[in-house]
Amino acid sequence: MNSSYHRRVPVVGELGSATSSQLPSTSPSIVIPLGSTEQHGPHLPLDTDTRIATAVARTVTARLHAEDLPIAQEEWLMAPAIAYGASGEHQRFAGTISIGTEALTMLLVEYGRSAACWARRLVFVNGHGGNVGALTRAVGLLRAEGRDAGWCPCTCPGGDPHAGHTETSVLLHLSPADVRTERWRAGNRAPLPVLLPSMRRGGVAAVSETGVLGDPTTATAAEGRRIFAAMVDDCVRRVARWMPQPDGMLT
């Protein structure tokens, strides 16, 4: 596929390209993209959340290397993405692979315990809202155990919930060849608080036959560039401040 997520690109600061012998002397901090594999309507790929989280994490890591920030004095590496999450609300749609909140919580806890044996700090960059329950429990526990972990969201103020204007715009910026514009159409555009009671009973399929919440037909690459830059700026600011809440979210 024509995307930075699928195409292997040599980038300074990628954990996957380091060797074990390089790490003990540096005690790096690591940025871990956390996404999902789930339906994103008829027009976006199943790994949309993972692509966005990976691109944000990669750009944040590069910014931490380049900018004159106190926390940038540490070595920062981007880890390979965790591409499966808690996506049960999308389970009625083909292609969705959800490991659930309990399994994801344990995965993140054991991941953090292992990585903290040699890494100074851990920050998870989350691309899927359904992962928040697992993140808060796992990172909160890691912090209670004395490990310096945190997480930050890939969010956009005022964005629509799922596979609509926001995510489609970002994918038009990151992976334009993989957005099937001939298949997009508006989904349920009601506010998320209005939809949640029905979604709790029957998932996304109960409120949208296409799996879309929002309107992707208004998306543009220019808007995606702006949204993506805002996501990166927000994450860099949170990491630079490094002020985790009790649940581990960086503020």
Curated annotation (Swiss-Prot):
It comes from the Bacteria. A divalent metal cation 1 binds at residues 38, 49, 128. A divalent metal cation 2 binds at residues 40, 49, 167. MftE appears to bind one Fe(2+) and one Zn(2+) ion per subunit. Fe(2+) seems to be catalytically active while Zn(2+) could play an auxiliary role. GO terms for molecular function: hydrolase activity, acting on carbon-nitrogen (but not peptide) bonds, in linear amides; metal ion binding; peptidase activity. It catalyses: [mycofactocin precursor peptide]-C-terminal glycyl-N-{5-[(4-hydroxyphenyl)methyl]-4,4-dimethyl-2-oxopyrrolidin-3-yl}acetamide + H2O = [mycofactocin precursor peptide]-C-terminal glycine + 3-amino-5-[(4-hydroxyphenyl)methyl]-4,4-dimethyl-2-pyrrolidin-2-one. Its EC number is 3.4.14.14. Keywords: Hydrolase, Iron, Metal-binding, Protease, Zinc. Its cofactor is Fe(2+); Zn(2+). Homooctamer. Belongs to the creatininase superfamily. This is Mycofactocin precursor peptide peptidase. The lineage of its organism: Bacteria, Bacillati, Actinomycetota, Actinomycetes, Mycobacteriales.
